[in-house]
Design a protein with these regions (language model features):
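Structural signature of the two symmetry-related core transmembrane helices
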Residues: 90-104, 287-302
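Hydrophobic core of transmembrane alpha-helices in multi-pass small-molecule transporters
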Residues: 114-128, 313-328
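Extracytoplasmic gate region of multi-pass secondary transporters
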Residues: 47-48, 220-273
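Glycine-rich segments within core transmembrane alpha-helices of 12-TM secondary carriers
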Residues: 145-172, 189, 353-365
Length: 407
């Protein structure tokens, strides 16, 4: 859509992109990212789900669980840095190649080492490309669509979580059946991603900045306040979603290993679509306070559930309530990550924020191994409180990005 247009200044580029009408190129960009995030959602809970496979001994569960965030962490840091250097579009073929190799490895795996390496490789590709995808979407979409598109695309990961968890619930009697359905679902997303990615344009913002950055004095990494706030948000969402929905199953409720991520993923997917109605009607700062305050309170109620030994049904209700605030917190974070960094450092900035969170997540898997459910929930509540602090800081010290052009 921009090949026939020439730009003399960066403001011309921004005005052109920010005021554009939705067209076929926007549809292709949204579709390829939705398919990629859906496949990532399938992979996001693959590690805890495959701990049920007989060739994974309980003593190796923790290493399987770590393989997923380890691959995602490596992918985020490497791909985020490279995307600022060589462009967004070029990396999308690399990421999908790595992801496909990992998926094939998961299907063919017959032992612990193979599944470990395959999950790492798949997450490196599809999980690692989230950084590049968020930067690309924020840079290419008009202001009036930017927030909704970022939420819509990232929410497809929740749909993937719910879908693959449902497969493991229904087909839990057969590893072969699980693998075949997983392969079919992955291939459907991968095929759409490949076809659409071949038609993707390069990020126009990145192209202009990369060739004129010496003239653009505003292309600096940024002040510490936005970076700190984004790190606090990332710590909350990464630790609480992954820990409550993914890790709680294998450690504390082995009978419900598939059911817990299914309920949480389905709840977040449904709420994600509902959030589209009001995400651009409320300022980002207020939305962040709503999300992280609600999440902190709902997580604290889990402590009462454990203290009074309430039925598992009550746990499910609390899980759904927390899923709403979890999705709202996820949405705010997904929107603000690309909005608060400049184009020259957007990939590196998002990768840095996510890198800190996933590093802590990996540490927490080992640190929390064997602790009581009550102490576990105290940790989760404290993690939500971290995000609440970040939201208060951003509300009082930050600036509004709703309906504002990004640099």
């Amino acid at each position: 859509m921009e090949k026939d247009v020439e730009f003399s200044t960066y403001n011309d580029v921004k005005n052109f992109l920010d005021s554009a009408r939705w067209n076929r190129t926007h549809t292709i960009m949204a579709l390829t990212m939705i398919s990629g995030f859906f496949v990532w959602g399938l992979l996001l809970v693959t590690a805890p789900l495959v701990t049920q496979w007989p060739f994974i001994s309980p003593s190796n569960d923790i290493y399987v669980l770590v393989s997923s965030p380890a691959g995602l962490l490596a992918g985020n840091l490497i791909l985020g840095y490279l995307s600022d250097k060589i462009g967004r579009k070029k990396l999308f073929i690399t990421t999908i190649t790595s992801g496909i190799a990992g998926i094939i490895g998961i299907i063919l795996s017959t032992n612990f080492i193979e599944i470990l390496a395959s999950i790492f490789l798949a997450e490196f590709g599809f999980g690692g490309e989230e950084t590049v995808s968020l930067a690309f979407l924020a840079e290419q979409f008009p202001i009036r669509y930017r927030g909704k598109v970022l939420v819509l695309v990232s929410n497809s990961a929740n749909a993937g979580v719910a879908a693959i968890s449902a497969v493991f619930i229904v087909a839990g009697y057969s590893i072969f059946t699980e693998k075949m359905i997983f392969l079919a679902m992955s291939l459907s997303g991968v095929i759409i991603a490949i076809v659409t990615r071949l038609k993707l344009p390069e990020s126009l913002r990145w192209s202009f900045v990369s060739s004129h950055y010496a003239e653009l004095t505003d292309q600096r990494f940024g002040s510490p306040v936005p970076i700190m706030v984004l790190m606090l948000f990332a710590i909350t969402i990464v630790l609480t979603f992954a820990l409550v929905a993914d890790i709680l199953g294998p450690y504390e409720y082995p009978k419900y290993t598939s059911l817990i991520p299914f309920i949480y993923g389905l709840g977040e997917a449904v709420f994600g679509y509902a959030i589209l109605v009001f995400v651009d009607r409320i300022g980002r700062r207020m939305l962040s306070v709503m999300a992280y305050a609600g999440g902190t309170v709902s997580m604290a109620v889990f402590l009462l559930y454990i203290y009074f030994r309430l039925p598992f049904d009550v746990f499910v209700i609390l899980l759904v309530v927390n899923a709403f605030f979890g999705e709202l917190g996820w949405a705010v974070r997904e929107i603000l990550q690309p909005e608060l960094f400049v184009t020259r450092y957007r990939g590196l900035g998002i990768a840095t924020v996510r890198g800190v969170a996933y590093s802590l997540y990996i540490i927490s898997i080992f640190a929390l191994s064997g602790i009581s459910v009550y102490n576990y929930m105290i940790f989760a509540t404290a993690a939500w409180s971290v995000g609440l602090i970040g939201s208060i800081v951003w509300y009082s010290k930050g600036y509004e990005t709703l309906n504002r052009s990004i640099s």
